[in-house]
Amino acid sequence: MSQTEPKDQDPVFQLKGSMLAITVLELSRNDLDSLDRQLAAKVAQAPNFFSNAPLVLALDKLPPSEGAVDLPGLMRVCRQHGLRTLAIRASRIEDIAAAIAIDIPVLPPSGARERPLESAEPVAPKKPEKPPEPTVKPTRVITTPVRGGQQIYAQGGDLVVVSSVSPGAELLADGNIHVYGPMRGRALAGVKGDTKARIFCQQLSAELISIAGHYKVSEDLRRDPMWGSGVQVSLSGDVLNIIRL
C-alpha cells in the first residue's frame, strides 16, 4: 500500500508584495453633508470608476481646529457612492482611536503628496521652502499625577511630568516628553512635525506613543522587550526606536 504525503503539508498560500491602484480620499474639512454632495457630483462624471473602488481615507491633513470625525458616518457616505474603505491614514489621536474601535487598519501619515485625480497637466515642482525657526518656550513641568481624561499640552517646548500618568490621560508637546513615573496613558511628542523630538519615561506601559505623527499603540508596545522598563523613544526615518535608559 503506497504512502502519500498528507495534504496539510503542502503550502496553501503565498505572501506576495503587490503595487495596487488605490484611491486616496484626502479630507480637508470635517463636513459630511458637503462631502456627500460633492462626491455625488464627482461620481456622476465617471460612475464606472467609482463602482466598488477600494479607498484609503486620509484624515492626516485635517486642520487641528476641526472636531472629531464621525468615522462610521464618513465610511457610510463613501459606501453610498461606491467607495469601499480599506484603511484610514491619520495622525490625530481621536481619529486613530475611532478606527481602532471599529477594527479599521490605520496607516501612518504620508510625507508625500498624492496627485489629484483630475490633474492632467504636469505641475512644475516647487522649490522647498525653508521651515521657520522654532520659537523656544520654557519647559512645562507637571508635579502632580495626570489623571485619566486629562490632556496636557506643552506648546513650543518640552513637557516634564514628575509623577505618574494614568490610562486615558494624554500628554502632547511640540518638543520632548519626559515622564518620571509610570507612563500608562498616551504620549505624543513633536506634534507639529519635529522629527528630532524624543520621549523619555521610567516605566513604559503606554496606550500610545507618537513622534511627529509616527506612532505605536499598546498592542505593538506590549510585544517590545522594553515594555515596563525605563526607555528612550526616538524617530529614525519612519521607524520609532525604543531603547533602554
From Swiss-Prot:
Keywords: Cell cycle, Cell division, Septation. Pfam families: MinC_C (PF03775), MinC_N (PF05209). Residues 112-132 have a biased composition (Basic and acidic residues). InterPro entries: CAP/MinC_C, MinC, MinC_C_sf, MinC_N, Septum_form_inhib_MinC_C. It comes from the Bacteria. Cell division inhibitor that blocks the formation of polar Z ring septums. Rapidly oscillates between the poles of the cell to destabilize FtsZ filaments that have formed before they mature into polar Z rings. Prevents FtsZ polymerization. Belongs to the MinC family. This is Probable septum site-determining protein MinC. The gene is minC.
